[in-house]
Every structure is written in C-alpha cells, then in structure tokens.
C-alpha cells in the first residue's frame, strides 16, 4: 500500500492574495474561493491542486517544505517575472556548480527558481 499526493496546502493570512499570485506564477486556474480558502488547479492536469487556507497566526520560521520551480526559459527571466507579480528575492545561491534563486511569495513563503534551458540546464533522460 502507498500514498499519493492529493493537494499541496498553504496556510496563509489572505487566501485570495496567494491564489492570485500562484495562479499568475504557475498558470493555474482558480477553481474556487470562499471566506476561508481559495484553490487552484493545473489546467494541464500534470501538477497538484493548490489549496490556500486561512490561519490566524502569521508565518514565523523558515518553511520546512518548499517548491523548486524549473523555468521554461532562463532563471533571470523567471525571477524578473515573478518579482513583477509580487515575489521578492531572498538570496541567490551558487554552490558546487549549481545555482538558484531563493524567493519569497507575498506572504513570505520560500520557493526556489532553478536554472532553465537558456542557463545550460539539460533534463535527464
């Protein structure tokens, strides 16, 4: 017997703000919204649904889990695009011939933008 991921859930203060940000960042569609939550789905059916659930407390420590996002073009282009949507750069990492940018969404949740094909990244076959 095994488990499969059904939904990726974000605790947040404002579900609509995060749903709007992640919808624009990932190209996901808004599936629903109510007073306590918003949810998105990947129109291609490949990605997990995202649920944004209101909680009373704010974020106070580093995420224990985060998203690593691979751009279709370059890391620099994607970092600039998500910055325009409301993300901020937390730090840039260059370790052992790997590099990525750690970013924060509008509520401070960490995510990483990795190298893309224009940066020399090649998918493993």
Language model features by range: what are they?
Residues 3, 13-17:
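N-terminal amphipathic/basic helix or basic patch
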Residues 16-35:
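N-terminal first-folded block
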């Amino acid at each position: 017997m095994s488990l499969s991921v059904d939904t990726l859930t974000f605790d947040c203060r404002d579900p609509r703000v995060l749903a709007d940000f992640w919808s624009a960042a990932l190209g996901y569609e808004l599936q629903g919204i109510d007073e306590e939550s918003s949810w998105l789905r990947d129109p291609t059916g490949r990605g997990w649904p995202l649920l944004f659930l209101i909680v009373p407390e704010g974020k106070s420590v580093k995420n224990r889990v985060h998203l690593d996002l691979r751009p279709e073009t370059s890391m620099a282009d994607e970092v600039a695009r998500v910055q325009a949507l409301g993300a901020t750069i937390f730090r840039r990492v260059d370790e052992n011939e790997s590099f990525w940018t750690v970013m924060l969404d509008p509520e401070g949740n960490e995510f990483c933008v990795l190298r893309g094909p224009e940066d020399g990244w090649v998918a493993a076959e």
